[in-house]
A protein has these predicted regions:
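Short alpha-helical transmembrane segments in multi-pass integral membrane proteins
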Residues: 1-21, 79-144, 188-248, 306-372, ...
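Helix-loop interface residues and adjacent transmembrane-helix termini in multi-pass membrane transporters
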Residues: 33-36, 45-48, 82-85, 160-161, ...
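Hydrophobic side chains within alpha-helical segments
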Residues: 38-41, 162, 181, 185, ...
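Short runs within selected transmembrane alpha-helices of multi-pass transporters and secretion channels
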Residues: 72, 141-159, 167-178, 196-211, ...
Length: 449
């Protein structure tokens, strides 16, 4: 079992960040890259309508990941602070509560969605033409959403336990399994959307098994704690879960924001450009997770460092870690923007072929979409910073503004002002406005202090 020697309270911050960031980044980027390969297989092996159908169902992935992040972040922050005070038993109780309650929630939601599949598909923006494909994909994805959630929570626990390299493997190995099975199921076996969904389900089950094996058999500090069912224990669990949800709510809302971006975007693209517009938009939505994963890797790597040192009031180390994360965010966001603009035609052709209306829509619009990457990167790091120091109110407010309120208004009104170009600029505008709000908030707080 791969375990790393990490001390969050004394190690050099750049070295500590590097030890956390590199394996986290590799695991996340590989996972996002495989997700793109999945889209390519579906687009080229099944067709543009199938690709659009996957994009319709994509908010479910965001939901499962969001719940996983909410409980994972909340439990990680609380456990980090307890560990900094040598309260190992309390930290173990927290992670056990987070895992058990989140599994109950996700299983209940999956059952509810499967009961009303057609209604939910139409609510997500499916047209009658896409509905059969959407339902086929849902049938093989929704029952396994709990495994997606478990994988996300488990990664936080393993990194906090001091094993970021093994956490990377928990992302990388399922991603490679997904890639292999995707190709086999879609091309040689011709299983279509069912094959693509089944490949994803099998891979995430493998990842979840790896998580459970580590926590049960190889964890150094963090272990599952046998739950108690007395009235006092239940009330304490409710209190602890409520606090973890508060701390992790902005992480959930970040995923919900991506789901909102897809959902509202699907509606607007369908309204203005039809199925071809949704297919073109799905290329941006498939590529966007790489940008998201890179910046999420920065934030998730810095979170235990900030939370631990916040717990022991080492503010100099907290500020040093935050500044380092901001610098990485600017560099990564800038590179992503330039790369998207330069390679947009090649990437779009992988999904859609190099001809047709959907391809033309994609290559003309995606460069505009990429202009918001730097501001997105900065916003993610700032929001995670506030989460990590238990400032959940501003973190939640900024997430709601950028991911739900401003982006919805931008999608609604920018096309009226700027035409089709305005649809693609809706996301960059919402990120820019949010960043300005965060900077103003920070300056006002610093002035008052």
């Amino acid at each position: 079992m791969m375990q790393d020697s990490i001390d969050f309270g004394t190690m050099n911050i750049p070295k500590l960040f590097r030890m956390m960031f590199i394996p986290t980044l590799l695991g996340m980027v590989l996972s996002a890259t495989i997700n793109i390969a999945d889209g390519i297989f579906v687009g080229r092996g099944v067709g543009n309508d199938a690709l659009a159908a996957v994009n319709i169902v994509a908010p479910f992935f965001m939901l499962a990941t969001g719940i996983g992040l909410m409980f994972g972040v909340g439990a990680s922050i609380v456990a980090s602070i307890h560990l900094s005070h040598q309260k190992v038993k309390v930290a173990n109780i927290n992670i056990t509560q987070a895992l058990s309650v989140s599994l109950c929630i996700m299983l209940s939601l999956s059952l509810l969605v499967m009961t009303f599949r057609a209604e939910v598909a139409l609510l997500l923006g499916s047209s009658e033409q896409l509905l059969p494909s959407v339902l086929e994909y849902m049938n093989w994805i929704v029952p396994f959403l709990a495994f997606y959630m478990l994988l996300n929570i488990g990664l936080f626990i393993i990194r906090l336990d001091g094993s970021p390299t093994y956490a990377m493997l928990c992302s990388a190995i399922p991603a490679l399994i997904n890639l292999t099975l995707d190709y086999i199921f879609v091309f040689p076996l011709h299983w279509g959307l069912m094959g693509a969904a089944l490949a994803s389900a099998i891979s995430v089950i493998v990842g979840s098994i790896m998580i459970v094996v580590y926590i049960v058999g190889f964890s150094k500090v963090l272990h599952l704690y046998r739950p108690k069912f007395s009235l006092k224990s239940i009330l304490l669990t409710i209190r602890n879960i409520g606090y973890m949800v508060k701390l992790g709510s902005s992480a959930f809302l970040t995923e919900a924001a991506i789901a909102c971006m897809m959902l509202v975007g699907n509606y607007i693209f369908m309204r203005y450009l039809g199925e071809d517009g949704v297919a073109a938009y799905s290329v941006a939505c498939y590529c966007f997770p790489i940008v998201f994963m890179v910046n999420n890797a920065i934030a998730q790597s810095i979170q235990p460092i900030i939370s631990y040192n916040y717990g022991i009031q080492q503010w100099k180390r907290v500020r040093q870690a935050f500044k380092l994360a901001l610098l990485c965010a600017v560099v990564c966001g800038g590179l992503a923007c330039v790369g998207t603009i330069l390679f947009c035609p090649k990437v779009s052709s992988l999904f859609l072929g190099n001809h047709g209306n959907a391809y033309e829509i994609a290559i003309s619009g995606i460069p505009y979409f990429s202009l918001g990457y730097v501001f997105f990167a900065l916003n993610i790091v700032c929001i995670w910073y506030y989460q990590s120091i238990e400032r959940f109110k501003p973190a939640t407010l900024f997430t709601i503004l950028r991911g739900i309120v401003i982006i919805t208004l931008s999608f609604m009104y920018l096309p009226v002002v700027c035409g089709i170009k305005g649809i693609w600029l809706a996301v960059p505008l919402s990120e820019l406005i949010t960043f300005v709000i965060i900077v103003v908030y920070y300056l006002l707080k610093r002035t008052r202090a």
